[in-house]
UniProtKB/Swiss-Prot annotation:
Organism: Methylibium petroleiphilum (strain ATCC BAA-1232 / LMG 22953 / PM1)
SUPFAM superfamilies: Urease, beta-subunit
The protein's name: Urease subunit beta
Family: Belongs to the urease beta subunit family.
Record has Cytoplasm as a keyword: yes
UniProt enzyme class: hydrolase
Keyword Lyase: no
Localization terms from the record: Cytoplasm
InterPro entries for this protein: Urease_beta-like, Urease_betasu_sf, Urease_subunit
Subunit structure: Heterotrimer of UreA (gamma), UreB (beta) and UreC (alpha) subunits. Three heterotrimers associate to form the active enzyme.
GO MF, any single term: urease activity
Reactions this protein catalyses: urea + 2 H2O + H(+) = hydrogencarbonate + 2 NH4(+)
Pathway the protein takes part in: Nitrogen metabolism; urea degradation; CO(2) and NH(3) from urea (urease route): step 1/1
């Protein structure tokens, strides 16, 4: 065994966020710079150059592994899956649009 080596099991694949509501949206970067969004960023509050239904994304984040991100190149369109925030569903910071309960 090498330090840091991963030994995957023969069991079923790990499922991210089971039993939580998800939403699939098409996102377009209408800006002239790349935009990267992290796994736990409140998606409705992302950079204004990203074009999508922000009301539908309220209270949701990317349904990707913790600590990872998705990058949107200028002019790029991509489909992403969002997932509801869990826990007490309280959001502070980001662009300051919520500052409390979702």
């Amino acid at each position: 065994m090498t330090p840091g080596e991963l030994l995957p099991s023969d069991g079923p694949d790990h499922v991210l966020n089971p039993d939580r509501r998800t939403l699939t949206l098409v996102i377009e970067n209408g800006g002239d710079r790349p935009i990267q969004v992290g796994s736990h960023y409140h998606f409705a509050e992302t950079n204004g150059a990203l074009r999508f239904d922000r009301a539908a994304a309220h209270g949701m984040r990317l349904n990707i592994a913790s600590g990872t991100a998705v990058r949107f190149e200028p002019g790029q369109q991509r489909t992403v899956e969002l997932v509801d925030y869990a826990g007490d569903r309280t959001v502070y910071g980001f662009r300051g649009l919520v500052q409390g309960k979702l």
